[in-house]
């Protein structure tokens, strides 16, 4: 009887561990730095590779392989389009064009490097970010903004895809 209880307790323990490892986090990190000497914003995005490929496949009805050896120039073009459609920055009330420079893979994360040019002064910045929100209701996109040493954070989600930083 004691042996059966011990086995049951161990079984419940291992099932609990397994359930915990299945749980996923749905978070993207977006670092936005104002570099006044260069009159630009420098943006670094960190998005989980599998989620990004799933979103691209869903949006464009084509299997993509961003971050994989099978990655094609067409995959990168679709990623650029997706970022442009889903991630927007308004400075002082005006929509700004983001320039995509490059991307790299670090473990299971895709890191993209973007800039916004011709930025002399920021009085307010509005961010619209709906990346991956079409896949996961739990998706959170964290915007970290550094404006001349003043740091601000903004948490966006599938229910709140826009926010203001001053």
Language-model features and meaning:
Residues 1-25:
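Bacterial Sec-dependent N-terminal signal peptides
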Residues 22-166:
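N-terminal soluble domains immediately following signal/targeting peptides that reside
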């Amino acid at each position: 009887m004691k042996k059966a209880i011990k086995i049951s307790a161990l079984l419940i323990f291992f099932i609990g561990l397994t359930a915990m490892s299945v749980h996923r986090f749905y978070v993207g990190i977006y670092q936005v730095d104002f570099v006044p000497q260069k009159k630009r914003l420098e943006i670094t995005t960190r998005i989980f590779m599998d989620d990004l490929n799933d979103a691209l496949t869903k949006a464009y009805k084509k299997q993509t392989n961003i971050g994989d050896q099978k990655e094609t120039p067409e995959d990168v073009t679709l990623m650029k389009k997706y970022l442009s459609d889903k991630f927007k920055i308004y400075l002082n009330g005006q929509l700004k064009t983001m320039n995509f420079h490059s991307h790299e893979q670090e473990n299971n994360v895709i890191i993209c490097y973007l800039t916004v040019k011709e930025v002399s002064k920021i009085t307010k910045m509005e961010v619209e970010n709906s990346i991956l929100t079409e896949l996961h209701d739990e998706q959170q996109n964290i915007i970290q903004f550094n404006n001349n040493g003043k740091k601000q954070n903004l948490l966006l989600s599938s229910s709140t895809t826009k926010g203001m930083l001053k």
